[in-house]
Amino acid sequence: MTVTATERIVTVFGTGNQAGAVARALLADKTSQFKVRAISRHPDSASSRTLSALGVQVVKADGWNLEELTRAFADTWAAFVNTNSDDPLFLQKGDGPTEFDLGKNIIDSLVAAKVQHLVYSCFASSVEQTKGKLFIKPMEMKYQALKYARETGHFATTCGIYAAWYYEQFLDKATADVFGGFPTTPDEEGYITFRAPLWGDDEHPSFVSITHDFGDMVHGILLEPEQWDGKSVPAASDVMTFEQLAQTLQNATGRKSRYIPLPSWEDFGRGIPELDDHKLLFAFTQATGGRYFGDVPTETKTALRLKRRAAEAQGKSGNEANLLSMEEWFKTNFA
């Protein structure tokens, strides 16, 4: 890729949901002359080919290979990084490599490649927020990775972005089964029933449309990275209680819906080892009064501000510059 003096390369690590959304948002920019690059272990995968067809430069590199990564990040002005907590490698017991190890390797390559700006998809520290009561591995590994990046002293700016509960997870049948069939399968009484542990007392659950909003939020950060340096951004499109979630589905589809809480967070995903870390998130929100984002409040104003800043750069206005509500999303996908 030939880079002119006014062009800036933004590289996303991966081609999955978050990285793909960020790449698409940046490609839509009409003012900043961003060039978008994506790093993939499998450049021939469907997701990689899709991004390549849109104009993204897809570069092959292994996240564990420092030299490959450094070459892949060459000439990069800013990077967006999200690592996959559900990678089977990180679910193994014992002393195997951790998600922090991967994050550290990526950060070391960013430093070696002299990348100036970093947006890192992460969480607050479960240990700090619960005063040592809970250690939730995915939260802690991502938190420690961003902390390490800041401690290098290398980056001009760093920003953490905390993704809320994906709207798109409700499209997955396996996920629906875990939550009692919600939002597609009626229970024995004919209700679409959302079954999940109680959340917390003070703040409500938050949700984000990865495909419609998340990429624009990161785009907004990268338009003014200095304004977001050292901050953490709650990436939420909508906020509501679980009772309101069920009512929203009913309003959108006309199908009677309800929320029935599970007796304990320990009952969530019982017998499914892959959900052991996920169930602890309910323990976390119960321990923190519903503060899923930990050190920042649950709200959508910040996300809307970023969305509108990105929309301006993309030449969009009206409803395209607004966050997608859960009700609108339910209507589109289930009505």
Swiss-Prot record:
It comes from the Eukaryota. It is an enzyme of class 1 (oxidoreductase). Pathway: Secondary metabolite biosynthesis. The keyword Electron transport does not apply. Its EC number is 1.-.-.-. Transmembrane segments: none annotated. GO terms for cellular component: nucleus. NADP(+) binds at residues 14-18, 41-45, 62-63, 83-85, 142, 166-169. Keywords: NADP, Oxidoreductase. NmrA-like family domain-containing oxidoreductase; part of the lnb gene cluster that mediates the biosynthesis of diastereomeric piperazines. Lna and lnb clusters encode sets of enzymes that produce overlapping sets of previously undescribed metabolites such as piperazinomycin-like metabolites or morpholine. The lna and lnb biosynthetic pathways appear to be part of a signaling network that controls the formation of sclerotia, a resilient overwintering structure. One primary function of the non-canonical nonribosomal peptide synthetases lnaA and lnbA consists in the reduction of L-tyrosine. This is NmrA-like family domain-containing oxidoreductase lnbB. It comes from Aspergillus flavus (strain ATCC 200026 / FGSC A1120 / IAM 13836 / NRRL 3357 / JCM 12722 / SRRC 167).
